[in-house]
């Protein structure tokens, strides 16, 4: 009954194909996905998010097989936007990166269970992660749209303002930062940029979709100074850069060779930054969430429950 309730909520028959995993050509049906959602603890109202997230993950540019089979240890991060956040009780304030509510906890868990049970992405089988990280259990957050002067992440990625949406990303574990000693946007963002550079030296030098999670205290300093998404992204694009010679400082000098002066940027362009407003009200905290091995996998944003680029049905006489 619980599985059927999920299917009824999204108006899908059990045998409807959600998508096909492109490498191994495995079909994911609505029923199989609903079964895993129910096992994860999802209510019917959560299921549209699970469906949209899975559809986004099956896009070629996401490279689902690569992200789930890699030794690199990434997990699937799901970011929620739009009215559905309030409808399902997804919180975006306290403990936002720590499974702060039922909705985000079970949605993230449903994605992981579906990968394991439908696509056999279990440790030691398809999943070859050397270490992994706790986000493999559940990795889902909601953006604090009401507490931010910015347009939402989804809007910045061409989703209409009145549509709910998910953004999926093959993501490493969060790297928390703190800067409570300045109100200047440049100095605050220097702390974020330093953490991005540290990831480039210690994990992967390749550019990709970095997530910046910015809590209210830092956002307020940005607002007072007149800094929005564009200014923040442009600044980090310029500051989050390393030279290959810097690898010598972290024990990787043998791979520098004659490329020591080659400069690498964390972001292919400012538009590749995924800036998310979220977090509790107190404290000068934020987080960097690095991508899995650069641009091999790209973040995908999709509307929930609607098709924005579908062809209209043919007119009938």
Task: Map each language-model feature to its residues.
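Non-transmembrane, aqueous-exposed alpha-helical and coiled segments at domain scale
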Residues: 1-317
């Amino acid at each position: 009954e619980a599985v059927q309730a999920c299917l009824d909520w999204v108006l899908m028959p059990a045998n409807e194909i959600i998508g096909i995993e492109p490498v191994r050509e495995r079909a994911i049906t609505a029923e199989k996905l609903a079964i895993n959602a129910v096992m994860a603890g999802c209510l019917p109202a959560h299921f549209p998010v699970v469906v949209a997230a899975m559809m986004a993950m099956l896009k070629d540019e996401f490279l689902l097989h690569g992200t789930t089979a890699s030794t690199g240890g990434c997990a699937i991060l799901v970011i929620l936007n739009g009215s559905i956040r309030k409808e399902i009780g997804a919180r975006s304030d306290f403990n936002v990166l720590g499974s702060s509510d039922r909705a985000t906890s079970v949605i993230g868990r449903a994605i992981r269970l579906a990968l394991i049970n439908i696509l056999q992405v279990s440790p030691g089988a398809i999943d070859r992660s050397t270490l992994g990280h706790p986000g493999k259990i559940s990795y889902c957050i909601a953006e604090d749209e009401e507490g931010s002067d910015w347009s939402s992440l989804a809007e910045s990625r061409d989703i209409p303002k009145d549509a709910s949406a998910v953004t999926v990303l093959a993501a490493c574990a969060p790297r928390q930062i703190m800067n409570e000693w300045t109100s200047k946007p440049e100095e605050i963002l220097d702390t974020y940029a330093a953490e991005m550079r540290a990831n480039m030296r210690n994990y992967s030098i390749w550019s990709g979709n970095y997530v910046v999670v910015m809590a209210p205290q830092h956002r307020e300093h940005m607002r007072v100074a007149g800094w929005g998404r564009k200014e923040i992204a442009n600044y980090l694009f310029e500051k989050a850069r390393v030279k290959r010679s810097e690898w010598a400082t972290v024990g990787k000098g043998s791979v520098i060779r004659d490329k020591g002066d080659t400069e690498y940027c964390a972001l292919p362009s400012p538009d590749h930054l995924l800036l998310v407003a979220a977090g509790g009200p107190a404290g000068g905290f934020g987080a960097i969430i690095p991508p899995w091995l650069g641009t091999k996998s790209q973040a995908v944003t999709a509307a929930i429950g609607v098709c924005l680029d579908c062809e209209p049905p043919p007119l009938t006489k």
